[in-house]
């Protein structure tokens, strides 16, 4: 079975537990924390995937490193160690966020701009795209892209809304070429 399918199954199980316990946000934050530590620390990843280190040692290590996370998240990490699938943790976290967002009718947007946006600008973008996408809310993450000449690009899921200067120039060029 592919890692993507397996990650989705783990995420669905965690999502169902979180929904039953009314802790969707808490699990999302904890998974984000675990994912962040896992992605930034190559030594942790290396340690957890070494075959010569016992599962018990790995679990003890995880319980020390992630002592602040809930029992359900920690147990999931233990199961991943037992099943030698710890490398799919980032995919599980991403899939969980997708499920939680669907439940709350929220979307995550990545906004690429030439400078950091103010909170008011982020709020305006969130409101405009919430209406456009039919979502109750949009959570905006701003990334400064030095390659942009001006304007913004907004990525929500698989969709990109290009309001950048390059995008506008490309559209004008296509129109001019089409009308020749």
Curated annotation (Swiss-Prot):
Its record classes its membrane topology as:
Peripheral membrane protein
One function term, GO molecular function aspect: proton-transporting ATP synthase activity, rotational mechanism
Q: Tell me which UniProt keywords the record has, alphabetically.
A: ATP synthesis, Cell membrane, CF(1), Hydrogen ion transport, Ion transport, Membrane, Transport
Localization, per the record, is: Cell membrane
Give any Gene Ontology cellular component.
Answer: plasma membrane
Q: Which InterPro entries match?
A: ATP_synth_OSCP/delta_N_sf, ATPase_OSCP/d_CS, ATPase_OSCP/dsu
Its domain of life?
Answer: Bacteria
Query: Where are the bilayer-spanning segments?
Result: none
Subunit annotation? F-type ATPases have 2 components, F(1) - the catalytic core - and F(0) - the membrane proton channel. F(1) has five subunits: alpha(3), beta(3), gamma(1), delta(1), epsilon(1). F(0) has three main subunits: a(1), b(2) and c(10-14). The alpha and beta chains form an alternating ring which encloses part of the gamma chain. F(1) is attached to F(0) by a central stalk formed by the gamma and epsilon chains, while a peripheral stalk is formed by the delta and b chains.
| Record's function text | F(1)F(0) ATP synthase produces ATP from ADP in the presence of a proton or sodium gradient. F-type ATPases consist of two structural domains, F(1) containing the extramembraneous catalytic core and F(0) containing the membrane proton channel, linked together by a central stalk and a peripheral stalk. During catalysis, ATP synthesis in the catalytic domain of F(1) is coupled via a rotary mechanism of the central stalk subunits to proton translocation.
- Report the family membership: Belongs to the ATPase delta chain family.
Among NCBIfam families, the record links this protein to:
ATP_synt_delta, PRK05758.2-2, PRK05758.2-4
User: What is the recorded name of this protein?
Assistant: ATP synthase subunit delta
Taxonomy-wise, where does this protein's organism fall, top ranks first?
Bacteria, Bacillati, Bacillota, Bacilli, Bacillales
Which gene is transcribed and translated to give this protein? atpH
